[in-house]
Amino acid sequence: MSALTPPTDMPTPTTDKITQAAMETIYLCKFRVSMDGEWLCLRELDDISLTPDPEPTHEDPNYLMANERMNLMNMAKLSIKGLIESALNLGRTLDSDYAPLQQFFVVMEHCLKHGLKAKKTFLGQNKSFWGPLELVEKLVPEAAEITASVKDLPGLKTPVGRGRAWLRLALMQKKLSEYMKALINKKELLSEFYEPNALMMEEEGAIIAGLLVGLNVIDANFCMKGEDLDSQVGVIDFSMYLKDGNSSKGTEGDGQITAILDQKNYVEELNRHLNATVNNLQAKVDALEKSNTKLTGELAVANNRIITLQEEMERVKEESSYILESNRKGPKQDRTAEGQALSEARKHLKEETQLRLDVEKELEMQISMRQEMELAMKMLEKDVCEKQDALVSLRQQLDDLRALKHELAFKLQSSDLGVKQKSELNSRLEEKTNQMAATIKQLEQSEKDLVKQAKTLNSAANKLIPKHH
């Protein structure tokens, strides 16, 4: 990657200002943000210069704005995907201290600020995304509640703080995607706050609003009374998305741990559902026992009443037989009255007998239902025990995998240390080899000199021998 500032003999104030401005917008203009699988890639653009040329060339503003929109959209994709995956793996309600959630709000803030028109005030120009968010309550009546809540928060003093609080409340309400879609569909209202080529006015804004639907599966809870939203600095942390070269070593072990964690969470959720079902069945059994007790009491009362009616019937039969005997000699009119009384008594007895049969039938149904509920409870308790055993086994496997991962990491560190020692030994051997090669060269040179001297002495000796002869 090339340096941000080219070497110059003497830095000038103009060069420093231009370099500083370029460094502040480096993530939007100097690089193109793209995704490689699940990772973030920053690619340098060769056609952007950070120092003024002798004859400055004007960059196309539409191209730069389109590049910024694409970068912000890719960052939003990565942030939303990472937030959903980490939240589901975490398996609990998120709070304001959760790092992926903080980065998501920072990315959303940058998206809402892109192409924002500056408002002139007494203190100068001011850019705030609180104005567009206030429009949502006019488009979606449900948003009026969170807008009023934001305005009532005592610790918020700036429009930026109100906008940040609004985003957090909308996420808690699980309506952020709906609100953003309603806002983006009203571009005639957004044109008052944004430039024509801003992210909220283009297709990238609609894509981000669609991606926000996935956040409805996340449960978040924020306490904004003690949180300083006015003075927070919204800086995107690229280190959360950049790919680490050494991260692929433990991918397989991490994948196994993730799979076991998913199984563990599934079994725990299933166990909670089974416990809830057992509690519901227990409540139904209790209600059936109370109903059974009540019906048993009613049956006893009905039996007593039937016995009383049978005794009364016997007494009426005796009286009727006595009356018949006595009325054989009496007037015919008295016999007719006694017959009517007897028929009424028989009718009353028939009704009471039918009532008793109905009560006994209902009691038998309640008893059979109770037996079925007890059988279902036993089966559910057996299923719960099996799931708990499976959960214990999965936890043991998770502990074993974690121990294996630590052992592999220790072995990897040991192997790295051994490789380092071998490389140092190799370098020392190479150094000794070079020294020995130099020594051999010196010895060869000395040998050549000795051979030369021997030849000289031999020739001198040959010259001296003839002279003696």
From Swiss-Prot:
GO annotation, biological process: actin filament organization; cell differentiation; negative regulation of axonogenesis; nervous system development; positive regulation of axon extension; positive regulation of cell migration; positive regulation of intracellular protein transport; positive regulation of retrograde axon cargo transport
UniProt-listed InterPro entries: RUFY1-3, Run_dom, Run_dom_sf, RUN_RUFY3
Positions bearing Phosphoserine: S34, S49
Keyword set includes Manganese: no
Name the record gives this protein: Protein RUFY3
Stated role: ARL8 effector that promotes the coupling of endolysosomes to dynein-dynactin for retrograde transport along microtubules. Acts by binding both GTP-bound ARL8 and dynein-dynactin. In nonneuronal cells, promotes concentration of endolysosomes in the juxtanuclear area. In hippocampal neurons, drives retrograde transport of endolysosomes from the axon to the soma. Plays a role in the generation of neuronal polarity formation and axon growth. Implicated in the formation of a single axon by developing neurons.
GO CC annotations, alphabetized: anchoring junction; axon; cytoplasm; dendrite; endolysosome; filopodium; growth cone; lamellipodium
Assembly with partners or alone: Interacts with PAK1. Interacts (via C-terminus) with Ras-related Rab-5 proteins. Interacts (via C-terminus) with Ras-related Rap-2 proteins. Interacts with PIK3CA and PIK3R1. Interacts (via N-terminus) with FSCN1; this interaction induces neuron axon development. Interacts with DBN1. Interacts (via the second coiled coil) with GTP-, but not GDP-bound ARL8A and ARL8B. Interacts with dynactin/DCTN1 and the dynein intermediate chain DYNC1I1/2. Directly interacts with DYNC1LI1.
This protein's domain notes: The second coiled coil domain is involved in the interaction with GTP-bound ARL8B.
